[in-house]
Amino acid sequence: MNVGKTNWTEEQKEAIDTRNCNLLVAAAAGSGKTAVLVERIVKIITNEENPVDIDRLLVVTFTNAAASEMRERIGDAIVNKLCENPNSRVIQKQLALIGKSKITTIHSFCLDVIKNNFHMLDLDPDFRVGDETEIILLKNETLEELFEDKYLQAEYTSKGINKNNNSIEFLKLVESYCGNKNDQVLFNMVMNLYNFSMSNPEPYKWLKKAAERFNVDDDFEFGDSLWAEVLMKNIQIQLLGMKGQLIESINIINSCASIESYRENLEVELSMLEKLIVASNNYEKLYEELKNVQFKTLKRCPKDADKEKQKLVRDLRDGVKKSLSKISEDILSQNSEEIKEEFKVLYPLMKTLSELVIEFDIRYKDKKKKRGIIDFNDFEHMCLSILTKSDESGNIVPSETALKIREKYEEILIDEYQDSNMVQEVILSTISRKDTENPNLFMVGDVKQSIYRFRQANPGIFLEKYNSYKENKDEKNRKVLLYKNFRSRKEVLDSVNFVFKQIMSVNIGELDYDDNEKLNLGANYEEIEENLISHSAELNIIEKSEDNTEIKENNEDEESVDNIMLEARLIGRRIIELKENFKVLDKNTNVYRKAEFKDIVILLRSTKGWANVFSDELKNMGIPVFADANSGYFDAPEVKTMLSLLQVIDNPRQDIPMAAVLKSPVGGFSVEDLIDIKVIEGDTFYDKLKVAADIGDDEFSVRIRTFLNRLYRWRKESLYTPIDEFIWYLYTDTGYYGYVGAVSGGIQRQANLKMLFQRAKIYSETSYKGLFNFINFINKLKLTSGDMGSAKILGENENVVRIMSIHKSKGLEFPIVFVGGLGKNFNLMDMNNPVLFHNYLGFGPEYVDYKKRISHKTLAKEAIKNRIRIETLSEEMRILYVAFTRAKEKLIMVGSVSDIKRSVFKWAVNLRSNQNKISEDYVLKSKSFLDWIASAVIRHKDAENLRDIMDTSKENIDNLVCDPSSWRVNVLSRNDVLSFNQLLLEEEKNINEKLTQFYKRLKEIRSSNYESVYIEEIKSRLEFKYRYEKAAELPSLLSVTELKRNINEDNDEYATKIFTPSLVKKPLFLEEVKKMSPSERGTAVHSVMQHLDFSSISCDMSIKNIRHQIDDMVFRRILTEKQAESVNINRILKFFQSPIGSRVIKAEKVYREFPFQIRVKSTEIYNDLPKIYDDENIIVQGIVDLFFKENDEIVLLDYKNDYINDENLNETVKKYTYQINYYKRALEIVTGLKVKEKYLYLFYTGDTIKIE
């Protein structure tokens, strides 16, 4: 199935070998574009006749992971070339230069340009990149200060202290779009507009131009505006859809003479529609033509007329009337004069909005400058300012710096070109020779996979070149189409093509899915007869409601957990069937094998609210699952508890957080306790607690006093401790970290707490400090960035089913792909914002009369709303394409509807059409992926059971789309899905019944005179012992310490001696106060040795120097005071004064607390295991105290704090030799270097013992 390195298609060869032109490679999904890009680069740099050094190529990718993979693949290819031609100096040179290669992300390239030319900017050379946390806080702070200043200026103006019309307009802006509650709407508007404008090469110019569009003069005609042009195009799509509906109505009349009386009305209305379509090229003409729209009453049909056909025609006609009425309402609501007056009112508001964003950016830049930081927007815009200048006409042209960089690169290669934005396009254009006689721009991508418009990616950049570049070989601007897919089976490709050739068009999808765009088979899958499940595409539709009488059409916006569970259960059942009965081609062995869990992925448009439900349901069905979700973190109980504790420490007079803490394991109070506290006198829980603490000396009062004392200590500690260290201090002081580790799901819970600590650590490195600011940051993070996914504790190579968003799946492939949640409505909520933004059309505001408190949408907003809807649905279509094209062997779609009959009638609108494509009007009005998929599939011969749901199913339908794809369409009720679990229970019950009958029969046999041979045979089968039963007792993982501990023990009883799981450490808050044990003192010494700054240590240093470092460790919460006091500093000093200590200080590289894992045969660890266990491996893990390099060899050092005397010295050395030898073995495996010496250092005696 894999494409061989030399077995390129003709199109791939052209993409690899074409030179001396600007080349656009349109690469379909699975067409091997990365392999082509790598081969092109390798051929350029290893050309013996005309080689180009790799550091003279600029390769731009859009993620760091992609850049790393590209560099690695190119490096491997160079090595392969060198093996073929080991004496080539050209190839040798390229291998040496690979480290200097410019294979980078666009942001990394921009950062390099900034660093090399910072003198051209007003930028501190010691600038740093601001952390995301810091940037969010700084933006919010800047905008809040700006708003405060505007309010203050407005107040001064109202009092006549100064005259500032701008501040008055600011208040009007607030009044118009914020209502009476707060100014959050305007705050979000400014922030969103700022982020949006930054994708423009000249944001200030764009902002001012967008506002000036409303500065109309007396000659202004709306019909000549860009808004009218967009409105007309959208209306034309709708009118063509209406025309199709009327033609369908007339066709029904043609087949049914009993409703012939409807024909005259419909033909008149069809003629009226055709006039409107002609007029839709001109706003004024359409305006006049709409005035003539009228629908006369339909003539009566005979009593014996076909009622079904009669209703169908009337419904189609009513749909046309409704749509046309909406268009008339929008267009005829205002004439040009009224629009002009409205724009004059809006102009000062839009101008103020633009100026507000510009002023915000100026202030934000100033704050960043003072802190010496830049953000990701600065990467591109600062780079742009270095590489460009304006000519006399104000046009952007390359600067002298850009021209110098242009000379450096022989070719510029851009991967994932469909995801570029305008700023990136200008940057790369300035340093390329694309407009010269020697063009050198290579661009590869697939516009059908452009799914990052929310990051301001602009697929129009790719499309402009795609539509203008030619395929001719002698063209300066040339394109090559890679249309073969080497990933998927024919069944998958056919089903993808069948859907998209019907729904994707230039108007919706921004590309016509024709023969040039369809996926063509390139993979070579051998047929496999023993598969019990076909490779046909599957569409599973669940009717999620039992009672269809009260269903609202739009209720798919918010799914209940119960409804999501239905899809999860259906998918779970299908996974179980596939695992048992489906075979996949193993990519490593190229041999068919049974499907495993890791072969399966479940893709969702959004994981929020879905992934956790899916995960829980699949786990309940015994299916291991890994959900790569971006939500659920802040809802985790352990995270909520710690955040509540932080809030209480910051301000204890907050009842809800206080109640949460008291009821948690940290507080240890019951619900009954809280009720008792609640009735005590006081305004807040905190006040009540203080009263209760003084009531008496009973157990309840003592517990409260203990809690308040701890709270006091925590509050005091928070004042001078960095937030990350303070959080970890709370984990240990409360014992909460240990507690959550001991309960169900402990590993995940502890990982979530670690994630909170890491977030605090990042925060503490910013210019913001303090507990209050951190809590404020977390609250804003919830509001602005939304939730985060829980900490990841499962690796990506585990044998589990994966759940992920479609966006995260881009670039990946899986043998079996489920696409779920297809019935969920598209998210078009952003179109309801009071002011819309569009790169081409500018602003689309609502008109608001804040004095009368009335508002209505403007035609400018309606135009932008229509345009955004088309662009959003085009993006959604591409997202669906990405989801479908992840599948290699099996594609399964799952969606839910409320009323299956109503949905089928909606999908069947295009069923009688003789057009291959579904009408654009229908595609535009669709509300979900399922609407698109089902309306296409219902036209396929295999969807008979879907058509059977319609009452007209007996009618012969001649317009099914002829297509080679094969489909399996299933329609299930809610009860069908819920019965899956019942079936599983019944199967289990049947097995139990059979076992009961078997044992009953066995008793009869034993009591009868049957031949003893049969009894012995049955007995032997029942008492059968599995040959490898000891494998179940072997551990998967052992520590070196456990090996050492058991080396001298009899290891026959594996489970009891070694593999008894250790209990989770008892939480600190449950432990009694006691002296430190020898092992705890040893841990303290190890911590000191791990964190000592060796670079500041010399052989003649004093105890004072070491004491200072240990005190610093206490301050940083690395050690407790108790641990620090237990450390014998003289012994530490003695170590560094020893010969081995001196070598450590002088070593070129020292590694401390180095963790490792190695695979060891079980028979090597347990000598008495039979040879049949040779293939059973055990992971041995450990931590090496210290090793250092000397002349590319390793010196290993293990140190111990044990009590040693002359009597037990030899025994101690012998005890640890086994352990040290494992360390040696591990280091040689992991580092590839030889361990030349091994030492054991004994702190108690100061002896250094060489281990032979």
Swiss-Prot record:
Free-text function comment from the UniProt entry: The heterodimer acts as both an ATP-dependent DNA helicase and an ATP-dependent, dual-direction single-stranded exonuclease. Recognizes the chi site generating a DNA molecule suitable for the initiation of homologous recombination. The AddA nuclease domain is required for chi fragment generation; this subunit has the helicase and 3' -> 5' nuclease activities.
Domain UvrD-like helicase C-terminal: 523-811
Co-factor(s): Mg(2+)
Any one Pfam family match given in the protein's UniProt record, by short name: UvrD_C
Protein name: ATP-dependent helicase/nuclease subunit A
GO MF annotation list: 3'-5' DNA helicase activity; 3'-5' exonuclease activity; ATP binding; ATP hydrolysis activity; double-stranded DNA binding
NCBIfam families assigned to the protein according to its UniProt record, in alphabetical order: addA_Gpos (TIGR02785)
High-level lineage: Bacteria, Bacillati, Bacillota, Clostridia, Eubacteriales
Gene Ontology CC: cytosol; DNA helicase complex
Subunit and partners: Heterodimer of AddA and AddB/RexB.
Swiss-Prot/TrEMBL keywords: ATP-binding, DNA damage, DNA repair, DNA-binding, Exonuclease, Helicase, Hydrolase, Isomerase, Nuclease, Nucleotide-binding
Catalytic activities: Couples ATP hydrolysis with the unwinding of duplex DNA by translocating in the 3'-5' direction; ATP + H2O = ADP + phosphate + H(+)
PANTHER family for this protein: ATP-DEPENDENT HELICASE_NUCLEASE SUBUNIT A (PTHR11070:SF48), UVRD / RECB / PCRA DNA HELICASE FAMILY MEMBER (PTHR11070)
Ranges of residues in domain UvrD-like helicase ATP-binding: 6-489
Record: residues binding ATP: A27, A28, A29, G30, S31, G32, K33, T34
PROSITE patterns given in the database record: UVRD_HELICASE_ATP_BIND (PS51198), UVRD_HELICASE_CTER (PS51217)
EC number: 3.1.-.-, 5.6.2.4
Family of the protein in this entry: Belongs to the helicase family. AddA subfamily.
Single GO BP term: double-strand break repair via homologous recombination
